[in-house]
C-alpha cells in the first residue's frame, strides 16, 4: 500500500520539462505529489506528444497561472509532409498520403508567410476546447462529426530551421491559443500535400525566455535522495517580471490589501505588480488613465526572502 502523502503549503513556480506521452494534468499531479504541495495548477496544456516547458504554479502562484496562460510562447516543430492524420500529429491514425512536391527554401518561405501575423485558425478536432461543455476530443473519440471552432490567433514569427524532404523543422513564436498542429495541417494543405506534426517541443514561455527546466525523473531522484525539492521553486515574483512594478510603503500596502483604490499620477497606466518596500509581492492591480490603482489579485503569506 502506497504511504499516505502529507501535503504542505508551498508557493512558487516550477519549470518542468514535460515528457512525451504524458498529459499536462498528469505531469502536474506527479510533480505536486513529489513536492507534497497542497495546491497546484499549470499554465496551459501541452499536447501529450509534446515535450518542453510547462510552468507549474503552486500555492499563491496559482493566482498568476492565467496570466502565464495568455503569454507568448515559442515551439520547435518537426513536421512531416505528405501524410495527414486524424489528430494532426504522429499520435493519430493516417488519413491520406500524397506525393510531396519538389520545394525550394524560397518556396517554403513563401508558403509560410501567410501564417505570420493575426490569422484565422481552425482548432484540431482532437483538442481540449469545449463545445457544449464537453472537450472536442471526447466527441471525436466517439466518432461524432465535429465542426471545430475557427478563432483569431497571432503568430509572431516562423523560422525555417531545416528542411530535408519530407521533414522540416520550424521555430514558431506565437500568442495564446495558437495550435501548432493546426499550423502544420494548414501549411501542408497550402503546399498541396498535407502534413502532420512528428514532434513538438515548447522552448520558452514569457517571461521564462531561458528556462532552467527539470524533468520528472530528475525531480524524483532529488526527492529520493532526501533533498527538499521545494528549493527548485522560483518565487512568485519571477512570474511578474514582465509587468510594470509599483513599490508601496507598509501603510499603502495595507490599504491596497483592504481593497482600497490608491491614486498617484506617477503610477504607470495598465496592469501592474505591486510590491512592499522589502521586495515581497503584494498583488496585481490595474491603473487607470487618472493614476488610480485598483487591486485585482492579492498575494498572501509571501516574503522577499523565500519562494515558498
Curated annotation (Swiss-Prot):
In alphabetical order, the GO MF annotations are: RNA binding; tRNA pseudouridine(55) synthase activity
**CDD domains to which the protein is assigned, alphabetical:** PseudoU_synth_EcTruB, PUA_TruB_bacterial
So where's the catalytic machinery, residue-wise?
47 (nucleophile)
Please give the catalytic activity noted in the UniProt record. uridine(55) in tRNA = pseudouridine(55) in tRNA
| Superkingdom of this protein's organism | Bacteria
What are the UniProt keywords, alphabetically?
Isomerase, tRNA processing
Q: Does the keyword tRNA processing apply?
A: yes
Return one Gene Ontology term, BP aspect.
tRNA pseudouridine synthesis
Q: List its EC numbers.
A: 5.4.99.25
Q: Which family does it belong to?
A: Belongs to the pseudouridine synthase TruB family. Type 1 subfamily.
Q: What HAMAP family does this protein map onto?
A: TruB_bact
Q: What does this protein do?
A: Responsible for synthesis of pseudouridine from uracil-55 in the psi GC loop of transfer RNAs.
What is the protein named? tRNA pseudouridine synthase B
* Gene name of the record: truB
